[in-house]
Regions:
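Active-site-proximal catalytic alpha-helix in oxidoreductases
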Residues: 23, 148-157, 176-177, 182-212, ...
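Hydrophobic/aromatic beta-strand patches that form the interior of the parallel beta-sheet core
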Residues: 36-38, 76, 90, 140-142, ...
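NAD(P)-dependent Rossmann-like dehydrogenase/reductase catalytic/cofactor-binding core
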Residues: 2-7, 31-33, 179, 210, ...
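ATP-dependent carboxylate/acyl-activation modules
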Residues: 2-5, 14, 19, 24-31, ...
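Rossmann-like NAD(P)-binding element
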Residues: 43, 58-116
């Protein structure tokens, strides 16, 4: 069955009234879509609207689509009503497997087999979420970074029953909707960005627990150090450029032994030739032939 034409897609269903659901709704409204928002409890509506109203000035500053309007928001506590006419569904319900499984079971009974449903889950696996869904082939993870209306990353990965064309479609849709989708190679708990964030978070907690640094020390160290650099080049490219000519190969060959130094409470992987070559080749591909002088200037 053919999936919706992305270029003419106009209506999106957003499920969930929390910060993620509200943030997604704000983003889609700013991009000029009609948004049909499902709230489990009507009492959630004031807080949900407040999230969007808080986000809107930022979105105005960033630039709204010509057709963007808060008037294009429709709120309901009827699930079937929410998904009626929607060509894409972004699910941001409570982060509990049993509740998500129940929700996807219901969606499988009322949503067409040509509609992709993406979950904002930050840690659950789609293979588990889709277990009881009749249209599991169209279900996948579309995990944003919070707030979704400001941070462009969306991690996209399917479950055991998800079809490749559903993932292809989701990648194209998120691009169309102004996001920066990252297609994961395989389904892993926590995906990519959250696992990296969690490693940093655990190390920070260790330093505070051992009275080695205060929370303020840690945040200042990041804000005025690696965080600024990583925003420009990312972790891998920053280390690729750091050693000048020779790049990642020189970095790993020179500093590889430092992986065994007690600089972290996390175990370092073994620096095998395969790992070394994967890092070197990956950074060379990202560099795209640019000189180290040019990359350093950036």
């Amino acid at each position: 069955m053919a999936l919706p034409d992305i270029s003419s897609l106009s209506t999106i269903a957003s499920i969930g009234g929390g910060p993620i659901g509200g943030g997604w709704a704000a983003h889609f409204l700013a991009r000029g879509f009609d948004v049909r928002a499902y709230l489990h409890d009507p009492a959630e509506e004031p807080a949900f609207r407040a999230i969007i109203e808080t986000a809107w000035p930022c979105l105005i500053e960033l630039g709204l689509a010509d057709t963007a309007s808060l008037e294009r928001l429709y709120i309901t506590s009827n699930l079937e009503d929410a998904v009626a006419g929607a060509a894409f569904i972004q699910e941001s319900a409570v982060e509990r497997l049993d509740e998500k499984q129940d929700l996807y079971h219901k969606l499988g009974k009322i949503v067409g087999a040509d509609i992709v449903i993406a979950s904002s889950t930050s840690g659950l696996l789609m293979s588990d979420i889709q277990a009881r869904c009749d249209i599991a082939a169209r279900t996948l993870v579309g995990h944003p970074f919070n707030p979704p209306y400001l941070l462009p990353l969306v991690e996209v990965v399917g479950g055991a029953k998800t079809t490749t064309d559903s993932i292809d479609w989701a990648m194209a849709f998120y691009h169309h909707a102004g996001k920066e989708p990252l297609r994961l190679k395989k389904e892993i708990p926590g995906f990519v960005a959250t696992r990296l964030q969690e490693a940093l978070w655990r190390e920070a907690l260790h330093m505070v627990a051992n009275d080695e640094a205060s929370p303020e020390d840690i945040d200042r160290a990041l804000r005025f150090g690696p965080a600024s650099r990583m925003a420009v080049q990312g972790q891998c490219m920053a280390f690729h450029v750091a050693c000048g000519e020779g790049g990642m190969a020189k970095n790993l060959d020179q500093f590889g032994p430092a992986l065994k130094l007690p600089w972290t409470r996390l175990d370092a992987p073994e620096l095998t030739p395969a790992l070394r070559n994967a890092m070197v080749d990956g950074c060379s591909d990202m560099a795209g032939g640019e000189s180290f002088k040019t990359m350093a200037a950036q």
